[in-house]
């Protein structure tokens, strides 16, 4: 028999346990609502998202997509604002400014993070790739 003609038939029989609802409430501590990783939930009605979270008994949702830019942070905070008790949105650092800011980069980042906190950011998302691609050529910190 040629491999392309081989279609195995499952023979294992196990007990099926339908799960109607979650056993415990949950916090989704790492997720995305934006287009890049989150399926564009940020553009869908908030009520639809809340219904889905309620069905899964997710009590709190941490959205990391505010870290793309301050504009994205503000968009996410505005969209989720009516249910702000259910969401935490993280901000981020614009690493592209490192070269331009030079020795002032750390001070600049601290000032931007204070601004983001003022917008309502609940934390800071540091992308893994940042540590792999950002390097200090010369700094006097």
Q: For each of these PLM feature ranges, what is it?
A:
Residues 1-82:
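An N-terminally biased module of ancient metal coordination in phosphate/nucleic-acid-related enzymes
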Residues 1-4, 8, 72-141:
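Active-site gating/metal-coordination segments in enzymes
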């Amino acid at each position: 028999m040629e491999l392309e003609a081989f279609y195995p038939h499952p023979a294992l029989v196990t007990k099926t346990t339908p799960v109607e609802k979650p056993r415990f409430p949950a916090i989704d501590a790492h997720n995305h609502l934006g287009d890049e990783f989150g399926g564009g939930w940020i553009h869908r009605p908030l009520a639809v998202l809340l219904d889905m979270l309620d069905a899964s008994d997710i009590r709190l949702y941490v959205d990391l997509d505010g870290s793309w830019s301050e504009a994205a942070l503000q968009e996410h905070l505005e969209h989720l604002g009516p249910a702000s008790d259910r969401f935490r949105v993280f901000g981020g650092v614009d690493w592209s400014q490192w070269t331009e800011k030079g020795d002032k980069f750390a001070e600049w980042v601290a000032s931007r993070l204070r601004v983001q906190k003022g917008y309502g950011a609940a934390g800071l998302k540091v992308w893994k790739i940042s540590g792999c691609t950002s390097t200090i050529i010369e700094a006097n910190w």
